[in-house]
């Protein structure tokens, strides 16, 4: 099973509240990281088509939860707040991300792996779309701590928004996300 990313589809304009990438959307990676993931997806599918290797691919949105890598947005924000440091945000902070609780992600991958269906791609999303700056404010509020938010230069090729249509995993495999963002956010 290949675990991929929503970044392989490229970015959606912030003001587009309609578009959701489905599994048939064109791959338009905009960074070396996302291009490497898109390339891996294509390589995996080529082995399925050529050799009938039983493969599946999942493309997920941003994960959050306990034990997340410390350089990621949520744990980094928590750590900076605990140390009384300024919060650093790229650009205007309005970039939108869909947040998927890690337990939901693991359960979805488990469902895919244990299904009899091969050669398929599944998007995994919880439809918890929140701007980066609002995530920082939510964490600050939850921790009852205030720090200055300092805007820094955006990273090159920084995508503005990813939104996935994950209905296929629901109707094909009967899997639905179970975790509520507000409840699980506190566990992070």
Regions found by a protein language model. Give the residues of each.
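C-terminal substrate-binding subdomain of Rossmann-fold SDR/epimerase-dehydratase oxidoreductases
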Residues: 81-188
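Active-site proximal helix/loop that lines the substrate pocket
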Residues: 5-10, 62-68, 94, 114, ...
């Amino acid at each position: 099973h290949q675990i991929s990313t929503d970044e392989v589809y490229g970015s959606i304009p912030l003001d587009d509240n309609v578009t959701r990438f489905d599994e048939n959307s064109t791959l338009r990676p905009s960074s070396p990281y996302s291009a490497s993931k898109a390339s891996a997806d294509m390589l995996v599918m080529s082995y399925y088509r050529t050799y009938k290797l039983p493969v599946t691919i999942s493309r997920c949105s941003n994960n959050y939860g306990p034990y997340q890598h410390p350089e990621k947005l949520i744990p980094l924000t928590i750590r900076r707040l605990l140390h009384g440091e300024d919060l650093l945000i790229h650009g205007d902070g309005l970039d939108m991300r869909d947040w998927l609780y890690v337990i939901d992600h693991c359960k979805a991958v488990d469902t895919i792996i244990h299904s009899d269906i091969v050669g398929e791609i599944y998007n995994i999303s919880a439809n918890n779309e929140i701007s980066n700056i609002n995530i920082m404010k939510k964490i600050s509020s939850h921790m009852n701590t205030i720090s200055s938010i300092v805007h820094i230069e955006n990273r090159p090729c920084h995508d503005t928004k990813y939104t996935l249509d994950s209905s296929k995993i629901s109707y094909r495999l009967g899997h639905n996300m179970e975790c509520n963002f507000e409840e699980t956010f506190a566990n992070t």
